Amino acid sequence: MKSKRQQKLYDHYKTVFGEEPIFSLKLKKNVLPTDMKPITTLVFKPTDEMPFWKLCTIGASDYLMPERDIGFGRKANRRNEYMMLIFPDVDIRNPSDDEDAPTDWLSLNSLLWATAEYAFNEKDNITVSDTIDMGIDGKYCGTVLLLPEIFKTPSTVKCYVSEHKYISIFQVMPITRELLTKKLRKKANGIYWLMEQFYTHDDDYKLISSKPFATL
C-alpha cells in the first residue's frame, strides 16, 4: 500500500516518462538501517523519446532531512528522491522473473540505493553537486548528485505533494576514484568541474553537450 506521497511520486514518474515501470525492486527491510522505511526502485525501459533506462526511487523522501543553508539566504529542500539514467545497451531484466537475467546491472542499482540511504544514515541533508565517497573498490567509488538536464522540462525535478511543498528528484551519477580525486585537488573549483564532466555549458550557462548515462 503506497502512502499519498508515494502515490504522487509514482504518478509523477509515469507522467514524466509517459509509461508504467516494467518492474520494481524493493530494498529488503533486513538490510535497511533501523527505523528506515523501505526504498523501491521503479525501472522504466528505453523509449523512442527517452532512449535510455530510468531507475527511480520511491521511499527516500519519507525521511525529512535537517535544514541546510545553501547560501544567499536559501535553504535546501528537505525531501529527496533519486534517479539514475543508464545506457540503453545495458541488459536490465527482472531477476525475479527471469532466471537467466544478468545481475551485473544491480551494482548500479546498489549505488542508487546507497545514495538514497545516505541522508538517513548520516542524519544529513544532501542536494545537487554533493558527492558521496562510499569507499568501495571497483569501477566506481561513489556518486554525485546532478540536475537531470537531459530532460527539457524543469518540472521533472519537482514532485509537488501540496501547493507549496515538493520532493526534489536528483540524478545520481556514479563516479570513479580518479574523478573524485581530481575534484578534490581543484578544491572550490572542483564542484563545478565535476558537474561539467556530465553536463557541459558555455559561458552563458547554456547546455552544449552531455554525457549523462551510467554504464557498467
Q: What are the language-model segments listed below?
A:
Residues 1-67, 73-78, 83-216:
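Acidic, proline/glycine-rich low-complexity IDRs
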